[in-house]
């Protein structure tokens, strides 16, 4: 049994490494001992220990977002495995390749009342791209080949488009302590090679590219819409395509188009503020929209695309079905960057810029100027955090943005810059849970990293801070503390004053300083924007974990947002009125 266990788990772990999985997040447990010990002994694999499985899974998810390579998750049997579910749901919808390894009791101990034994078969349901319940360890050569093959298959399926989590259930009998030495690695490597997986990027046939180009070229009023998409080379390719087609790009903050050295002439970063005015939005209806990536954060954009059924929406996606408007006319199954390059190869550049694209860029300049000019100079305002961070963050930094209000403020107030910055968030299922853990996982490969997060989301994942202490991570957390769920103040529920605070505002009146210090972090509460800038700069220069709490008022925050949106609407309406009643692009 000892040889069977040692050789089998060693073959599986070595197969993972050979298939490109070189990072693992392990939570302690008895039944997972063989996997944990084999991973610890493998020279080609780096592992991070994380005690709480729920936090561990989000930590691994953040690692994958930053590294853009599959990461393995390892836990023991029972409810430990169930705690992975929220992060696996997020990984599924945000297309993050996780290789989830859950240790299990052997088949004879299932469904008979054995301790720490739950039904782990298909535990994650449709949120796992692929599931396998491994055979019990054997020391025969065919079974060692089987173990290596299953490892390679898991890694390949996780990384294949659309990427996502896979679940490998690993039943193990006692005794659980393997003997892992150099002889074991030599044995499993001589028995069989790990299958080599060759994969390419999805491309369209030339005739389909030509047909698509003719549709785009025929449009008088074209737009490109880019949601969350983090792909090397895409920014350069799509901005070149925008210039060639003379199509403005409505760029979500997670599209990676707002920051960097690429051409941003056609990048529209204030479209959310522009489209909030329905009268203005109704004058800006395009003929065609070419959409890349996930659906953007902006609700006005979503409603605009859904309401104007005359818009021909073309969704480019190499897998899955991402069209919540239910109005897409065409789906293009292609790698996004490859398609841009294919179109550029045959495109005929427009002879001159159209009034359509010029008007969009002029409106964007107006909106941006209004927002900047009317930001409060002294008072705390949550949106201003992003304009400040855009100045404070060094080139190459990563900004991780929490859900609810932070990501929406990033959409409005994170303006285009030539400084290379990477913007990440958990926008698959859009939950407020696990954000601290995800950001700290990303910080392993993306330093320096700044997380902007709300107080309820921070509270939800406080125990995720332990990772910073255990692994010596560098992260700056800007805690937007409005004492409750700030986003609900913008929703219809806010009109019901009686039950609102109890049901939706949910103030906690918590002071987080002692909790942060317990995890070895520094805590600061600035009283002025000057102090805020000082604490952020100090944290970036010092390293370690720092939490900077910005205390705001939910009521004042809503008032300032609405004031700014109204000012933008007024100035845009005035601008369009000066152009006359007929649209200049008709």
Swiss-Prot record:
<dbReference type="Pfam" id="PF16582">
    <property type="entry name" value="TPP_enzyme_M_2"/>
</dbReference>
<dbReference type="InterPro" id="IPR029061">
    <property type="entry name" value="THDP-binding"/>
</dbReference>
<keyword id="KW-0474">Menaquinone biosynthesis</keyword>
<dbReference type="GO" id="GO:0070204">
    <property type="term" value="F:2-succinyl-5-enolpyruvyl-6-hydroxy-3-cyclohexene-1-carboxylic-acid synthase activity"/>
</dbReference>
<dbReference type="InterPro" id="IPR029035">
    <property type="entry name" value="DHS-like_NAD/FAD-binding_dom"/>
</dbReference>
<comment type="subunit">
    <text>Homodimer.</text>
</comment>
<comment type="similarity">
    <text>Belongs to the TPP enzyme family. MenD subfamily.</text>
</comment>
<dbReference type="InterPro" id="IPR012001">
    <property type="entry name" value="Thiamin_PyroP_enz_TPP-bd_dom"/>
</dbReference>
<keyword id="KW-0460">Magnesium</keyword>
<dbReference type="GO" id="GO:0030976">
    <property type="term" value="F:thiamine pyrophosphate binding"/>
</dbReference>
<comment type="pathway">
    <text>Quinol/quinone metabolism; 1,4-dihydroxy-2-naphthoate biosynthesis; 1,4-dihydroxy-2-naphthoate from chorismate: step 2/7.</text>
</comment>
<dbReference type="InterPro" id="IPR004433">
    <property type="entry name" value="MenaQ_synth_MenD"/>
</dbReference>
<dbReference type="Pfam" id="PF02776">
    <property type="entry name" value="TPP_enzyme_N"/>
</dbReference>
<dbReference type="InterPro" id="IPR032264">
    <property type="entry name" value="MenD_middle"/>
</dbReference>
<keyword id="KW-0808">Transferase</keyword>
<dbReference type="GO" id="GO:0030145">
    <property type="term" value="F:manganese ion binding"/>
</dbReference>
<dbReference type="GO" id="GO:0009234">
    <property type="term" value="P:menaquinone biosynthetic process"/>
</dbReference>
<keyword id="KW-0786">Thiamine pyrophosphate</keyword>
<dbReference type="InterPro" id="IPR011766">
    <property type="entry name" value="TPP_enzyme_TPP-bd"/>
</dbReference>
<comment type="function">
    <text>Catalyzes the thiamine diphosphate-dependent decarboxylation of 2-oxoglutarate and the subsequent addition of the resulting succinic semialdehyde-thiamine pyrophosphate anion to isochorismate to yield 2-succinyl-5-enolpyruvyl-6-hydroxy-3-cyclohexene-1-carboxylate (SEPHCHC).</text>
</comment>
<dbReference type="GO" id="GO:0000287">
    <property type="term" value="F:magnesium ion binding"/>
</dbReference>
<keyword id="KW-0479">Metal-binding</keyword>
<keyword id="KW-0464">Manganese</keyword>
<protein>
    <recommendedName>
        <fullName>2-succinyl-5-enolpyruvyl-6-hydroxy-3-cyclohexene-1-carboxylate synthase</fullName>
        <ecNumber>2.2.1.9</ecNumber>
    </recommendedName>
</protein>
<dbReference type="Pfam" id="PF02775">
    <property type="entry name" value="TPP_enzyme_C"/>
</dbReference>
<comment type="pathway">
    <text>Quinol/quinone metabolism; menaquinone biosynthesis.</text>
</comment>
């Amino acid at each position: 049994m000892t040889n069977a266990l040692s050789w089998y788990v060693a073959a599986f772990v070595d197969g993972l490494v050979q298939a490109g999985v070189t990072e693992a997040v392990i939570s302690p447990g008895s039944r997972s001992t063989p996997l944990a010990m084999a991973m610890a002994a493998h020279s080609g694999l780096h592992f991070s220990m994380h005690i709480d499985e729920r936090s561990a899974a989000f930590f691994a998810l953040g690692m994958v977002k930053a590294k853009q390579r599959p990461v393995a998750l390892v836990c023991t049997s029972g409810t430990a495995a169930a705690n992975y579910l929220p992060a696996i749901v997020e990984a599924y919808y945000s297309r993050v390749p996780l290789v989830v390894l859950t240790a299990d009791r052997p088949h004879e101990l299932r469904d008979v009342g054995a301790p720490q034994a739950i039904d782990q078969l298909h535990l994650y349901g449709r949120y796992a791209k692929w599931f396998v319940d491994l055979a019990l360890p054997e020391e025969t050569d065919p079974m060692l080949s089987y173990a290596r093959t299953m490892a390679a298959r898991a890694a390949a399926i996780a990384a294949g488009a659309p990427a996502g989590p896979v679940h490998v259930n690993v039943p193990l009998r006692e005794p659980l302590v393997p003997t892992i030495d150099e002889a074991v690695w030599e044995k499993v490597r001589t028995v069989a090679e790990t299958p080599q997986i060759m994969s390419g990027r999805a491309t369209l046939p030339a005739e389909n590219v030509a047909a698509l180009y003719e549709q785009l070229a025929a449009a008088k009023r074209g737009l490109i819409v880019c949601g969350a998409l983090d792909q090397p080379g895409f920014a350069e390719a799509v901005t070149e395509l925008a210039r060639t087609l003379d199509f403005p790009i409505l760029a979500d903050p997670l599209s990676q188009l707002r920051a960097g050295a690429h051409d941003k002439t056609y990048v529209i970063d204030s479209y959310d503020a522009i489209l909030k005015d329905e009268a203005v939005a109704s004058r800006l209806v395009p003929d065609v929209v070419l959409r890349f990536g996930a659906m953007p954060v902006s609700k006005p954009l979503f409603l605009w695309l859904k309401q104007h059924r005359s818009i021909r929406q073309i969704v480019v996606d190499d897998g899955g079905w991402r069209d919540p408007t239910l109005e897409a006319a065409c789906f293009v199954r292609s790698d996004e960057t490859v398609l841009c390059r294919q179109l550029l190869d045959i495109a005929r550049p427009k002879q001159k810029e159209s009034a359509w694209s010029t008007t969009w860029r002029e409106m964007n300049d107006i909106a941006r100027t209004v927002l900047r000019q009317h930001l409060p100079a002294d008072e705390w305002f949550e949106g201003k955090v992003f304009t400040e961070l855009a100045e404070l963050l060094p080139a190459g930094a990563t900004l991780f943005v929490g859900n609810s209000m932070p990501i929406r403020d990033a959409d409005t107030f994170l303006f285009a810059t030539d400084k290379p910055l990477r913007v990440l968030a958990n926008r698959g299922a859009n939950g407020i849970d696990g954000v601290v853990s995800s950001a700290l996982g990303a910080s392993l490969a993306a330093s320096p990293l700044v997380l902007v997060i709300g107080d309820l989301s921070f509270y939800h994942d406080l125990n995720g801070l332990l990772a910073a202490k255990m692994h010596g991570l560098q992260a700056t957390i800007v805690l937007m503390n409005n004492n409750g769920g700030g986003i609900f103040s913008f929703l219809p529920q806010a009109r019901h004053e009686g039950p609102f605070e109890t049901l939706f505002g949910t103030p906690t009146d918590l002071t987080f300083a002692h909790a942060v210090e317990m995890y070895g972090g520094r805590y600061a509460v600035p009283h002025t924007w000057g102090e805020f800038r000082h604490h952020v700069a100090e944290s970036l220069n010092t390293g370690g974990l720092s939490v900077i709490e910005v205390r705001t008022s939910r009521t004042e925050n809503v008032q300032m947002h609405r004031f700014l949106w109204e000012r933008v609407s007024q100035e845009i309406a005035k601008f369009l009125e000066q152009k006359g009643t007929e649209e200049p692009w008709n």
